[in-house]
């Protein structure tokens, strides 16, 4: 049964809630260090810092509270936004980054590394709630949890019978308990919040899937911009970011030698491609599992062996899930793995690996080695090493993607926020940013890498039918 008494009350007198404000100086220094590596964001501050297109608008962020995100927050603040922020993962916050932003006054921050699920959803609701009890004008979302809370809140207000049910999923029950408390205090609150929201910009593949589902069902409550499918996000953050941060997470957690090992990568989308390249670069033999024949063919033609998880478990030393799907690695798979195989996930949510099996099956026991590194003894008598409790390994066990590649993503996020703020004609649909802006984001990052572009002549541009200054490719071009 859903129970409002289980939910912690909001405390709107709190300016921030972070782990340790004494870490602020360290955070400020890291932010200064990253400025040179975020040229896109710095250029947007120069371009829009005077006109301040976000002036007077309230922005809620639900996105990993890292140093890179601190630079995004700084950019939104310089463009005039009034900001409240929570992380989108219980392990991804860098506490010095959260402290630095709280200390700067650029945003109200509710995030710390190692939150419980109850903490997490309390933080999300705190980020969605201003001191007067009202909500945001704009959302910056990663994984769709802020969007989910608003939509579920409206659904509950329209059908309070939902609060009389009990839910098997622990996290969803926590959400419903929070919504029960909100409904008890103000049964029309979430409808007012939704009515105020001008739109959301969504960072990641999983969150975008949620948005398209809402649109297809006619349930999307406000306009949305799909930042993930901007080329300068998905083909850079997802691929090149994961190529570096996956290995960082695995090595910090385990100190394992990757060379010579067999690494199984589940999923060969942009994230999986980056993971496979990373592990091959360290000298591993990489196996890929895929459901999509196109992605499977790509993997095979890059020289990877494409097989099923049922076969791969017999060989794998390290397993990485990168699918955005559910129960990709099951209890049966884990029971068949080698002793002390390493199992981790780089997809957004924690259900790609069946953690529920480990946590509820008699005979499975957990020994914590260090934060975010657990040795699970299985019914088989063998053990596996699970990283970050099945959540994002690169952020749970390391610091996520490097600043430069995140500058690509966050420049897109900022441009999306400007579009949502300034375009009153957007409908309740999912949009993508135009190709011209995608190319602009790339241009802003070329000088840092010493790149000099060739310029088309007018004759050449006319010959291929494009403007001299772009865009150079049609919308359907794959890159």
Curated annotation (Swiss-Prot):
Recorded superkingdom: Bacteria
Known cofactor(s): NAD(+)
Pfam families on file: AdoHcyase, AdoHcyase_NAD
Lineage of the organism: Bacteria, Pseudomonadati, Thermodesulfobacteriota, Desulfovibrionia, Desulfovibrionales
GO molecular function terms attached to this record: adenosylhomocysteinase activity
Annotated localization: Cytoplasm
Family, similarity comment: Belongs to the adenosylhomocysteinase family.
Protein name, per record: Adenosylhomocysteinase
Note on cofactor: Binds 1 NAD(+) per subunit.
Organism encoding this protein: Nitratidesulfovibrio vulgaris (strain DSM 19637 / Miyazaki F) (Desulfovibrio vulgaris)
Annotated SUPFAM superfamilies: Formate/glycerate dehydrogenase catalytic domain-like, NAD(P)-binding Rossmann-fold domains
Reaction it catalyzes: S-adenosyl-L-homocysteine + H2O = L-homocysteine + adenosine
Annotated binding of substrate, by residue: 66, 142, 203, 233, 237
InterPro entries, per database record: Adenosylhomocyst_ase-like_sf, Adenosylhomocysteinase-like, Ado_hCys_hydrolase_NAD-bd, NAD(P)-bd_dom_sf, S-Ado-L-homoCys_hydrolase_CS
Pathway in which this enzyme or protein is active: Amino-acid biosynthesis; L-homocysteine biosynthesis; L-homocysteine from S-adenosyl-L-homocysteine: step 1/1
Keywords: Cytoplasm, Hydrolase, NAD, One-carbon metabolism
EC number: 3.13.2.1
List of residues binding NAD(+): 204-206, 238, 267-272, 290, 325, 346-348, 394
GO cellular component, one term: cytosol
Residues that span the membrane, as ranges: none
GO annotation terms (biological process): L-homocysteine biosynthetic process; one-carbon metabolic process; S-adenosylmethionine cycle
Biological role stated in the UniProt entry: May play a key role in the regulation of the intracellular concentration of adenosylhomocysteine.
């Amino acid at each position: 049964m859903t129970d409002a008494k289980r939910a912690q009350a909001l405390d709107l007198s709190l300016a921030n809630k972070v782990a340790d404000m004494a870490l602020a100086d360290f955070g400020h220094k890291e932010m200064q260090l990253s400025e040179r590596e975020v040229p896109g964001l710095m250029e947007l501050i120069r371009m829009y810092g005077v006109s301040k297109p976000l002036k007077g608008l309230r922005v809620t962020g639900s996105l990993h509270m890292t140093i890179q995100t601190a630079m995004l927050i700084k950019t939104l603040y310089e463009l005039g936004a009034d900001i409240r922020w929570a992380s989108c993962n219980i392990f991804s916050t860098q506490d010095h980054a959260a402290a630095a932003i709280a200390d700067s006054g650029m945003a109200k921050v509710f995030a710390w590394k190692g939150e419980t699920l109850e903490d997490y959803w309390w933080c999300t609701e705190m980020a969605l709630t201003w001191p007067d009890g009202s909500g945001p004008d704009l959302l910056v979302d990663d994984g769709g949890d802020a969007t989910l809370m608003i939509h579920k809140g409206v659904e509950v207000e329209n059908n309070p019978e939902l609060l009389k049910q009990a839910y098997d999923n622990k996290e969803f029950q926590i959400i419903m308990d929070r919504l029960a408390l909100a409904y008890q205090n103000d049964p029309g609150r979430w409808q007012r919040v939704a009515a105020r929201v001008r739109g959301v910009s969504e960072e990641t593949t999983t969150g975008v899937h949620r948005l398209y589902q809402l649109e297809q069902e006619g349930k999307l409550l406000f306009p949305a911009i799909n930042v993930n499918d901007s080329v300068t996000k998905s083909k850079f953050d997802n691929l090149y970011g994961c190529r570096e941060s996956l290995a960082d997470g695995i090595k910090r957690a385990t100190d394992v030698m990757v060379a010579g090992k067999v690494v199984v990568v589940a999923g060969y989308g942009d994230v999986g491609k980056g993971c496979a390249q990373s592990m091959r670069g360290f000298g591993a033999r990489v196996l890929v599992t895929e459901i999509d024949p196109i992605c499977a063919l790509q993997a095979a033609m890059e020289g990877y062996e494409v097989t099923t998880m049922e076969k791969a478990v017999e060989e794998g030393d390290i397993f990485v899930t990168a699918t955005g799907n559910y129960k990709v690695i099951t209890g049966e798979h884990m029971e068949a793995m080698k002793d002390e195989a390493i199992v981790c996930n780089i997809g957004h949510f924690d259900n790609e690996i069946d953690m529920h099996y480990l946590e509820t099956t008699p005979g499975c026991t957990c020994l914590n080695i260090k934060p975010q590194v657990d040795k699970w003894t299985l019914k088989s008598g063998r053990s596996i090493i699970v990283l970050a409790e099945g959540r994002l390994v690169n952020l749970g066990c390391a610091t996520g993607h490097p600043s430069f590649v995140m500058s690509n993503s966050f420049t897109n996020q900022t441009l999306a926020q400007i579009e949502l703020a300034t375009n009153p004609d957007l409908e309740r649909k999912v949009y993508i940013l135009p190709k011209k802006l995608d190319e602009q984001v790339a241009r802003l990052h070329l000088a840092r890498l010493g790149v000099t572009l060739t310029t088309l002549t007018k004759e050449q541009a006319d010959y291929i039918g494009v403007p001299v200054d772009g865009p150079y490719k049609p919308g359907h071009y794959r890159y």
